[in-house]
Curated annotation (Swiss-Prot):
Membrane spanning stretches: 4-24, 30-50, 61-81
Any one GO molecular-function label of the UniProt entry: NADH:ubiquinone reductase (non-electrogenic) activity
Compartment(s): Cell inner membrane
Source species taxonomy: Bacteria, Pseudomonadati, Pseudomonadota, Betaproteobacteria, Burkholderiales
Superkingdom assignment: Bacteria
Functional summary from the UniProt entry: NDH-1 shuttles electrons from NADH, via FMN and iron-sulfur (Fe-S) centers, to quinones in the respiratory chain. The immediate electron acceptor for the enzyme in this species is believed to be ubiquinone. Couples the redox reaction to proton translocation (for every two electrons transferred, four hydrogen ions are translocated across the cytoplasmic membrane), and thus conserves the redox energy in a proton gradient.
Protein's recorded name: NADH-quinone oxidoreductase subunit K
Length: 101
């Protein structure tokens, strides 16, 4: 049986991978959005693990709120990405300063 430490290590590894993904790739908007989603997944893994091992369902309920916010964040991020690609024909983060007014 897996202990709480196993799930926390998994969450920490996922979080570290997402941090590395953001810092190593600062140009592509899609990769940055995927890394942020992975970061939220790592946090949700820790919430579910603590909720299960403490016998409380509040952590699992909170995961649904985090998933809702993550879905809204992904939708807004992809909308910005589509706007960027339509106006500039690129998805580089460095070109975001050209989207004015």
């Amino acid at each position: 049986m897996l202990s709480l430490a196993h799930y926390l290590v998994l969450g920490a590894i996922l979080f570290a991978i997402s941090i590395v993904g953001i810092f190593l790739n600062r140009r592509n908007v899609i990769i940055i959005l995927m890394a942020i989603e992975l970061m939220l997944l790592a946090v949700n893994t820790n919430f579910v693990a603590f909720s299960h091992y403490l016998g409380d369902v509040h952590g699992q309920i909170f995961v649904f709120f985090v998933l809702t916010v993550a879905a809204a964040e992904a939708a807004i991020g992809l909308a910005i990405l589509v706007t960027l690609f339509r106006s500039l024909d690129t998805i580089n983060v460095e070109d975001l300063d050209q989207l004015k007014g």
